[in-house]
């Protein structure tokens, strides 16, 4: 397989293939043939040589030069660069018809303003700047309506079939991107009618609770337990419990005493007490 066939097959092109192999033809020659050429004597090396007479095989290296009687040198450039340049021109000309837009974008100038484009009496600046179809009249760009420009831009790409350039990359590079509706929305009216709930996206909330327990044993044996709870909203609640030596704990004046979760009996009573009471 020649370089041209490999290049065309990789990019998905088909067509007439050159039977010459100018790049790899010189690599397939034997060293014996090179030695024979060095031993040959003559003024002309190229088309005047016997090697270039008659039909040449694709493996022949078709580049030579000869000396004219006036002392000049003439090159016979049959290396295949003309075919290479012609193939590249054909490839990139086909690519241009597929990728380039139909016409370059034009920006309206101050002189292209028409009476239909001017803002109507009583029409607000916001309404005049809304994109079509939210506004009542389509915009005019460069002397043509926006609907005409959209119809031209929405024309399908030429059907290349299986021989389209780079058709093997369709999974990675989609030819026609998915169209999205880009329209202006009147959020003021929507908020006044429905409120901010449907407009604003719901934000996820996190619920957590931070618990800090501090125990202080006084010299007389009294144990003071301070329990501070901070929730996700930032609310803080502090519970103080006093327990005298050899007596049950009693609550402080700040808040009622919650069940203690320090020992295993309190944990079992908390989780299983209600279930046994309901039986």
Curated annotation (Swiss-Prot):
<feature type="region of interest" description="Required for localization in sarcoplasmic reticulum">
    <location>
        <begin position="183"/>
        <end position="279"/>
    </location>
</feature>
<dbReference type="GO" id="GO:0015629">
    <property type="term" value="C:actin cytoskeleton"/>
</dbReference>
<dbReference type="GO" id="GO:0043066">
    <property type="term" value="P:negative regulation of apoptotic process"/>
</dbReference>
<dbReference type="GO" id="GO:0031965">
    <property type="term" value="C:nuclear membrane"/>
</dbReference>
<feature type="compositionally biased region" description="Low complexity">
    <location>
        <begin position="57"/>
        <end position="67"/>
    </location>
</feature>
<comment type="similarity">
    <text>Belongs to the HAX1 family.</text>
</comment>
<feature type="modified residue" description="Phosphoserine">
    <location>
        <position position="192"/>
    </location>
</feature>
<dbReference type="GO" id="GO:0016529">
    <property type="term" value="C:sarcoplasmic reticulum"/>
</dbReference>
<keyword id="KW-1003">Cell membrane</keyword>
<feature type="region of interest" description="Disordered">
    <location>
        <begin position="16"/>
        <end position="67"/>
    </location>
</feature>
<feature type="compositionally biased region" description="Acidic residues">
    <location>
        <begin position="30"/>
        <end position="42"/>
    </location>
</feature>
<dbReference type="GO" id="GO:0005759">
    <property type="term" value="C:mitochondrial matrix"/>
</dbReference>
<keyword id="KW-0472">Membrane</keyword>
<feature type="region of interest" description="Involved in ATP2A2 binding">
    <location>
        <begin position="203"/>
        <end position="245"/>
    </location>
</feature>
<keyword id="KW-0703">Sarcoplasmic reticulum</keyword>
<feature type="region of interest" description="Involved in HCLS1 binding">
    <location>
        <begin position="114"/>
        <end position="279"/>
    </location>
</feature>
<dbReference type="GO" id="GO:0005938">
    <property type="term" value="C:cell cortex"/>
</dbReference>
<feature type="region of interest" description="Required for ITGB6 binding">
    <location>
        <begin position="270"/>
        <end position="279"/>
    </location>
</feature>
<feature type="region of interest" description="Disordered">
    <location>
        <begin position="97"/>
        <end position="265"/>
    </location>
</feature>
<protein>
    <recommendedName>
        <fullName>HCLS1-associated protein X-1</fullName>
    </recommendedName>
</protein>
<feature type="region of interest" description="Involved in GNA13 binding">
    <location>
        <begin position="176"/>
        <end position="247"/>
    </location>
</feature>
<dbReference type="InterPro" id="IPR017248">
    <property type="entry name" value="HAX-1"/>
</dbReference>
<dbReference type="GO" id="GO:0030136">
    <property type="term" value="C:clathrin-coated vesicle"/>
</dbReference>
<feature type="region of interest" description="Involved in PLN binding">
    <location>
        <begin position="203"/>
        <end position="225"/>
    </location>
</feature>
<feature type="compositionally biased region" description="Basic and acidic residues">
    <location>
        <begin position="217"/>
        <end position="239"/>
    </location>
</feature>
<keyword id="KW-0496">Mitochondrion</keyword>
<keyword id="KW-0968">Cytoplasmic vesicle</keyword>
<feature type="modified residue" description="N-acetylserine">
    <location>
        <position position="2"/>
    </location>
</feature>
<dbReference type="GO" id="GO:0030833">
    <property type="term" value="P:regulation of actin filament polymerization"/>
</dbReference>
<feature type="region of interest" description="Involved in CASP9 binding">
    <location>
        <begin position="175"/>
        <end position="206"/>
    </location>
</feature>
<dbReference type="GO" id="GO:0016324">
    <property type="term" value="C:apical plasma membrane"/>
</dbReference>
<feature type="region of interest" description="Mediates interaction with UCP3">
    <location>
        <begin position="210"/>
        <end position="279"/>
    </location>
</feature>
<dbReference type="GO" id="GO:0000932">
    <property type="term" value="C:P-body"/>
</dbReference>
<keyword id="KW-0539">Nucleus</keyword>
<comment type="function">
    <text>Recruits the Arp2/3 complex to the cell cortex and regulates reorganization of the cortical actin cytoskeleton via its interaction with KCNC3 and the Arp2/3 complex. Slows down the rate of inactivation of KCNC3 channels. Promotes GNA13-mediated cell migration. Involved in the clathrin-mediated endocytosis pathway. May be involved in internalization of ABC transporters such as ABCB11. May inhibit CASP9 and CASP3. Promotes cell survival. May regulate intracellular calcium pools.</text>
</comment>
<feature type="region of interest" description="Involved in PKD2 binding">
    <location>
        <begin position="184"/>
        <end position="279"/>
    </location>
</feature>
<keyword id="KW-0007">Acetylation</keyword>
<keyword id="KW-0597">Phosphoprotein</keyword>
<feature type="site" description="Cleavage; by caspase-3">
    <location>
        <begin position="127"/>
        <end position="128"/>
    </location>
</feature>
<dbReference type="GO" id="GO:0005739">
    <property type="term" value="C:mitochondrion"/>
</dbReference>
<comment type="subunit">
    <text>Interacts with ABCB1, ABCB4 and ABCB11. Directly associates with HCLS1/HS1, through binding to its N-terminal region. Interacts with CTTN. Interacts with PKD2. Interacts with GNA13. Interacts with CASP9. Interacts with ITGB6. Interacts with PLN and ATP2A2; these interactions are inhibited by calcium. Interacts with GRB7. Interacts (via C-terminus) with XIAP/BIRC4 (via BIR 2 domain and BIR 3 domain) and this interaction blocks ubiquitination of XIAP/BIRC4. Interacts with TPC2. Interacts with KCNC3. Interacts with XPO1. Interacts with RNF217.</text>
</comment>
<keyword id="KW-0256">Endoplasmic reticulum</keyword>
């Amino acid at each position: 397989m020649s370089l041209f066939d490999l290049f065309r097959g990789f990019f998905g092109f088909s067509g007439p293939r050159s039977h010459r192999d100018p790049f790899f033809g010189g690599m397939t020659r034997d060293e014996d043939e090179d030695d024979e050429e060095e031993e040959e004597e003559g003024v002309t090396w190229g088309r005047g040589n016997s090697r270039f007479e008659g039909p040449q095989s694709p493996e022949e290296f078709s580049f030579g030069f000869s000396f004219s009687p006036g002392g000049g040198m003439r090159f016979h450039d049959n290396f295949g660069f003309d075919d290479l340049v012609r193939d590249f021109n054909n490839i990139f000309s086909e690519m241009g018809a597929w990728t380039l837009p139909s016409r370059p974008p034009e920006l309206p100038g101050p002189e292209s303003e028409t009476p239909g484009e001017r803002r109507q009496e009583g029409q607000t600046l916001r309404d005049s700047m809304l994109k079509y179809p939210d506004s009542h009249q389509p915009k005019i760009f460069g002397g043509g309506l926006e609907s005409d420009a959209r119809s031209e831009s929405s024309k399908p790409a030429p059907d290349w079939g299986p021989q389209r350039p780079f058709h093997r990359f369709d999974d990675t590079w989609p030819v026609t991107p998915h169209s999205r509706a880009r329209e202006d929305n009147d959020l003021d009216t929507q908020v006044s009618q429905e409120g901010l709930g449907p407009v604003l996206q719901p934000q996820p909330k996190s619920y957590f609770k931070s618990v800090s327990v501090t125990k202080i044993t006084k010299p007389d044996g009294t144990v003071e337990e301070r329990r501070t709870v901070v929730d996700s909203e930032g609310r803080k609640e502090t519970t103080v419990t006093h327990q005298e030596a050899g007596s049950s704990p009693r609550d402080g004046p700040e808040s009622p005493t919650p069940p203690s979760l320090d020992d295993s009996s309190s944990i079992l009573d908390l989780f299983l007490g209600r279930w046994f009471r309901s039986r």
